[in-house]
Amino acid sequence: MTDKRDLVILGGGLVGMTLALAAARAGITSHVVDKATPEELTVEGVDGRASAISTASWNLFCNIGLKDRLDPLGCPISAIAVTDGMKPGRIDFEPKPGDGTLGRMYANRDIRIALFEAARAEPAIAWSS
């Protein structure tokens, strides 16, 4: 029997899995293909980076069902300073009182785990490696 899907996604990283979950929310089935398994992609130490998640990206994560998984893990970005080490000067960004934060910081591993947990619970998403 052949499992027919609407969409093939090459790469099960942050972008690919976000797309798969967003597509599932819209009723689109997908098959994610990656050279590694979800377990390999979430093992501790495989990706020590962190990502700054903008408010717009956070809203997307909330809409695809990641809020409860990610909310307790990140830390708010309350100010941003932009500098160029080779030149004088800087630009500072701070939200006005009541505007909330400028975004949130998350370990990439935490985002991946949340994405894979949500995808495992979603029958519209298939995976192969």
Residue ranges and their predicted role:
Residues D3, L73-S129:
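Conserved N-terminal helical subregion
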Residues R5-V32:
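N-terminal Rossmann-like FAD-binding beta1-loop-alpha1 element of flavoenzymes
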Residues A24-R49:
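Glycine-rich FAD pyrophosphate-binding loop
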Residues T29, K67, A126:
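Residue-level detector of anion-binding/catalytic polar loops
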Residues G45-G85:
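N-terminal FAD cofactor-binding segment of flavoenzymes
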